[in-house]
Amino acid sequence: DEPDGVPTHQKQ
């Protein structure tokens, strides 16, 4: 899933 550290977690 989204990596820890990215502020804008945009799931495509």
Swiss-Prot record:
It comes from the Eukaryota. GO terms for cellular component: extracellular space. Hemolymph. Belongs to the tyrosinase family. Hemocyanin subfamily. Hexamer. Does not function as a hemocyanin. This is Pseudohemocyanin. It comes from Liocarcinus depurator (Harbour crab). The lineage of its organism: Eukaryota, Metazoa, Ecdysozoa, Arthropoda, Crustacea.
